[in-house]
């Protein structure tokens, strides 16, 4: 069964289509690709698995070219993105071109940013192949590359025209990558939907076994929540910032440890537990809630504490560069219970040090 979620943004609205065997049927994409040149951006890991299948799906289109990039967060850079621009320019491709992002979050972010930048904007389509990209990064129009001094510091808000989520892609996903994606799934339950959080607690084994119905429900619910939030606040001026639960701590871990050493979802897992502990210290949540949050991450073999090699000074150095910082003041997304979160700027360095030291 195929599920569709619509991201309603007026003239820039687009569908998210979720189901099995979607890479075998190009018909749903046809109207978005009519009379267009197509450049498929993928990486060295995904290309042998799915590039041929996508090219076959697009066999009715005359100009379909791939660009194959190295795989890994450490390659999410302006210099690597230049390979996309070079391919476009060498083929004299203009604004009648569609970029297709075939891969995980890194490929999606880079392709989207390239689409936003090339000739001041061309269309792009997301075909996410990892759980993390299916439930989070492919939806909502955040595109970016990293800088040595911070994650996702160079980018743009730029919405795709279409998101195609084939859940069969998860069958080739390494277990560590699947677990990292579950960190973002769990995040939605904590910050938006307590009932979904409880459902996740009850369905750990089904999800780990890649049960089709469980996966499609979880991915669909995450996309519904993400669409709802993006419709309310596309450019993260208010409620969309809640989607960054765990990310201020998490981005600090990624930057300090070196991009790719910790997967993004692993850093978000540890970061969300740190945020929950901070909430408990501030009296926002009971310790029992912190225990449930920690236990659910642990059930998917995700880290629930900071790296032993990181100290408070290293954390705070990176956290001060967070995009939510306002007038020099750190703003943290903290859980207020299950299904609720808020933004707090009253957390002192002393309180943060206590949280980090005890984690």
From Swiss-Prot:
Biological processes annotated in GO: amino acid biosynthetic process; aromatic amino acid family biosynthetic process; chorismate biosynthetic process
Subcellular location: Cytoplasm
Annotated InterPro entries: Dehydroquinate_synthase (IPR050071), DHQ_synth_AroB (IPR016037), DHQ_synth_fam (IPR030963), DHQS/DOIS_N (IPR030960), DHQS_C (IPR056179)
Catalytic activity: 7-phospho-2-dehydro-3-deoxy-D-arabino-heptonate = 3-dehydroquinate + phosphate
Enzyme class, first EC level, given as a word: lyase
Binding site for NAD(+): 71-76, 105-109, 129-130, 142, 151, 169-172
Gene Ontology CC: one annotated term: cytoplasm
UniProt: Zn(2+) binding residues: 184, 247, 264
Function: Catalyzes the conversion of 3-deoxy-D-arabino-heptulosonate 7-phosphate (DAHP) to dehydroquinate (DHQ).
Family indicated by similarity: Belongs to the sugar phosphate cyclases superfamily. Dehydroquinate synthase family.
Protein name: 3-dehydroquinate synthase
């Amino acid at each position: 069964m195929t599920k569709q979620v619509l991201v309603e943004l007026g003239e820039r609205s687009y569908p998210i289509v979720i189901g099995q065997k979607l890479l075998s049927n190009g018909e749903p994409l046809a109207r978005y690709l009519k009379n267009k040149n197509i450049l498929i951006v993928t990486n060295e890991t995904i290309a042998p698995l799915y590039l041929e299948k996508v090219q076959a799906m697009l066999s009715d289109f005359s100009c379909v070219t791939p660009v194959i990039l190295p795989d890994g967060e450490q390659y999410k850079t302006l210099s690597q993105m230049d390979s996309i621009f070079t391919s476009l320019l060498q083929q004299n491709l203009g604004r009648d071109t569609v970029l297709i992002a075939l891969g995980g979050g890194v490929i999606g972010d880079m392709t989207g940013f390239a689409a936003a930048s090339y000739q001041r904007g061309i269309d792009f389509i997301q075909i996410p192949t990892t759980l993390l990209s299916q439930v989070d990064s492919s939806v909502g129009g955040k595109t970016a590359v990293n800088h040595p001094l911070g994650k996702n510091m160079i980018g743009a808000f730029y919405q795709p025209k279409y998101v195609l989520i084939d859940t069969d892609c998860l069958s080739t996903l390494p277990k560590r990558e699947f677990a990292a994606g579950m960190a973002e799934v769990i995040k939605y339950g904590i910050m938006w939907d307590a009932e979904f959080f409880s459902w996740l607690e009850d369905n750990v084994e089904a999800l780990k076994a890649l049960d089709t119905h469980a996966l499609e429900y979880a991915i669909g619910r995450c996309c519904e929540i993400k669409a709802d939030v993006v419709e309310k606040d596309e450019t993260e001026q208010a409620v969309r910032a809640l989607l960054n639960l765990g990310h201020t701590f998490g981005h600090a871990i990624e930057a300090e440890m070196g991009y790719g050493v910790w997967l993004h979802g692993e850093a978000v897992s540890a970061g969300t537990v740190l945020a929950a502990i901070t909430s408990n210290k501030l009296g926002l949540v009971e310790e029992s809630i912190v225990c449930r949050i920690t236990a659910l991450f642990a059930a998917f073999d995700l880290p629930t504490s900071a790296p032993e090699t990181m100290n408070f000074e290293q954390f705070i150095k990176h956290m001060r560069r967070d995009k939510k910082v306002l007038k020099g003041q750190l703003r943290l997304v903290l859980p207020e219970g299950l299904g609720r979160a808020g933004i707090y700027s009253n957390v002192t360095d002393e309180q943060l040090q206590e949280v980090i030291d005890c984690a």
